[in-house]
Design a protein with these regions (language model features):
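Non-transmembrane, aqueous-exposed alpha-helical and coiled segments at domain scale
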Residues: 1-423
Length: 423
C-alpha cells in the first residue's frame, strides 16, 4: 500500500482537523509528521468542539491507529493536558496512540528561550506562538536535543540538566525582563514525562513501512500550512519545520515513491495569524465580516486571524511545491451574503505583472491584481449535495479549478463533520 498526504495550502487554520476526521474511516493509520503544540486542529461533531494540539485527529475513531512521527516536537506538559481532555470522553487513547522514539521533546527552558528571543526583537517580532517550537528545532538541528527515546535512559535527568543549564545562559544573554519559576516548571515537566512514559514508544519508520507491506492504508497529517514552511514559506515569518509534502517523508521515514495522493486544503478566502506579509489582507468591513462569520480566532493562541480575499498566486505556488492531486475547499459558507467577491490572480512586482510568488511579498513590494466574481446569498449550511449549491458558488469553484489545474473534490459548508459535500 501507499501513503496519502493531507496538507494545508495557506498560512494554516485551513480546516485540516475536520477533514482528517471525515477521512479517517478510510484509513487504518493516521500519522502526524511535523510541528508541535503551536498548531491546533479543530474538530466539531455532536455539538462539541475539540481542539487537538499534538495528537492526530484520527483519535476520535474507534479503529484507527494514530502515530506521532519523528518530525514532531512534543511538550510533555501540553501533551498530558491533551490526554486528560480526551479522558473526559471515556476514550481508550493509550491503545490507539503510538509515539516515535525519535520525536524531540520541548523543555520548559525551550519555552522561556522562545519568549526571551521574541521579546528581544522589539518591532521585528515574527509572531511566535511562544510554545518553544523554534528553540526545540534549533537544538534538533544543532544536535543538542533530547528525544522521546531518551526518557527510557538511566541518565535522562542528567541530559536534561546539561541542556537546561545551557538554555539558562542563553536566556541571560538576551537581557530581557522575564519573571518565571523554573523549579515549578520543571516539577510539572517531570510529572508529565512520567505520563508520557506510560504510552507506547515505537520506531515509527519501521512500523509504517511494515504496515505498508502488510497492506495497511495510511494518511499522513500535516500541521499549519505550506506558506509557513521553513524553506518555502514567507520567511522569516514561518514555522520551524517543513510543512510541505517533502516533510512527510522526513517526518515519518517513508520514501517519496510511497506517496500516492496529496490532498490540499484551502479556505475559500485567506487568513493569517500573527505577523508577516499578506498581500490580499482586508482592513474594511468585508474582512471584519469574514472574521465574525468564520469565527476566525487561532485554535491554540486565541489570537484573531487576519482575513483577506483568496490569493490564487499563493495557492498555485502551494499546489506546485506539494504536487497536490485533489483540492478540498473549506468555509464556502462564510462567503454567503457577499454581493461581489474578489480573487487575486497576479501581482504588480517591480514594475511588472507576475503570476508567480516572488522572493519577497512584503506589502511595499507587491500590489495584488484582483478580478471580481459574483457572490451568492444562499445559506449553505444545510446543503448536502453538490447540485444544491448556488450557481455562483459552482462558478467560483470552476474558476479556481481552471486556474490551479487541480480538481476540487470536497466543499465544506460548515464546521461539523456532517457539513461536508463530496463533488
Amino acid at each position: 500500500m501507499t501513503v496519502d498526504l493531507l496538507l494545508g495550502l495557506q498560512w494554516g487554520d485551513e480546516g485540516k482537523g475536520k477533514i482528517v476526521d471525515v477521512l479517517t474511516s478510510k484509513y487504518d493509520i493516521i500519522a502526524r509528521f511535523q510541528g508541535g503544540p503551536n498548531a491546533g486542529h479543530t474538530l466539531e461533531f455532536d455539538g462539541i468542539k475539540h481542539v487537538l494540539r499534538t495528537i492526530p485527529s484520527g483519535i476520535f475513531h474507534k479503529t484507527a491507529i494514530n502515530i506521532i512521527g519523528n518530525g514532531v516536537v512534543i511538550d510533555p506538559v501540553v501533551f498530558q493536558k491533551e490526554l486528560e481532555g480526551l479522558e473526559k470522553f471515556n476514550m481508550d487513547v493509550k491503545s490507539k496512540l503510538l509515539i516515535s522514539r525519535k520525536a524531540h521533546l520541548i523543555l520548559p527552558t525551550h519555552r522561556l528561550l522562545d519568549a526571551a528571543s521574541e521579546a528581544s526583537k522589539g518591532k521585528a517580532k515574527i509572531g511566535s506562538t511562544l510554545k518553544g517550537i523554534g528553540p526545540t528545532y534549533m537544538d534538533k538541528t544543532g544536535r543538542n536535543g533530547i528525544r522521546v527515546g531518551d526518557i527510557e535512559l538511566a541518565d535522562f535527568k542528567e541530559r536534561y540538566r546539561t541542556l537546561a543549564d545551557k538554555h539558562e545562559a542563553m536566556i541571560a544573554f538576551y537581557d530581557v525582563d522575564m519573571q518565571y519559576n523554573l523549579q515549578e516548571m520543571e516539577a510539572e515537566f517531570f510529572e508529565a514525562v512520567e505520563v508520557l512514559k506510560s504510552l507506547q514508544f515505537i520506531d515509527s519508520e519501521e512500523y509504517l513501512n511494515n504496515a505498508m507491506k502488510a497492506g495497511k492504508s495510511i494518511l499522513a497529517e500535516g500541521a499549519q500550512g505550506s506558506l509557513l514552511d521553513i524553506d518555502f514559506g514567507t520567511y522569516p515569518f514561518v514555522t520551524s519545520s517543513n510543512t510541505t509534502a517533502a516533510g512527510a517523508c522526513t517526518g515519518l521515514g517513508i520514501a517519496p515513491n510511497k506517496v500516492k495522493d496529496v490532498f490540499g486544503i484551502f479556505k475559500a478566502y485567506t487568513t493569517r495569524v500573527g505577523s508577516g506579509p499578506f498581500p490580499t489582507e482586508l482592513f474594511d468591513g468585508d474582512g471584519q465580516t469574514m472574521a465574525r462569520v468564520g469565527n476566525e480566532f487561532g485554535a491554540v493562541t486565541g489570537r484573531p486571524r487576519r482575513c483577506g480575499w483568496l490569493d490564487l498566486v499563493a495557492l498555485k505556488y502551494a499546489v506546485q511545491v506539494n504536487g497536490v492531486t485533489q483540492l478540498f475547499m473549506m468555509k464556502g459558507d462564510v462567503l454567503s451574503g457577499f454581493d461581489t467577491l474578489k480573487v487575486c490572480t497576479g501581482y504588480k512586482y517591480k514594475g511588472e505583472v507576475v503570476s508567480h510568488l516572488p522572493y519577497n511579498i512584503e506589502e511595499e513590494n507587491v500590489t495584488p491584481i484582483f478580478i471580481e466574481k459574483k457572490g451568492w446569498q444562499a445559506d449553505l449550511t444545510g446543503m448536502t449535495k453538490y447540485d444544491e449549491l448556488p450557481v455562483e458558488l459552482k462558478e467560483y469553484i470552476e474558476f479556481i479549478e481552471k486556474e490551479v489545474e487541480v480538481p476540487i473534490k470536497v466543499v465544506s459548508v460548515g464546521p461539523d463533520r456532517t457539513q461536508t459535500i463530496l463533488k
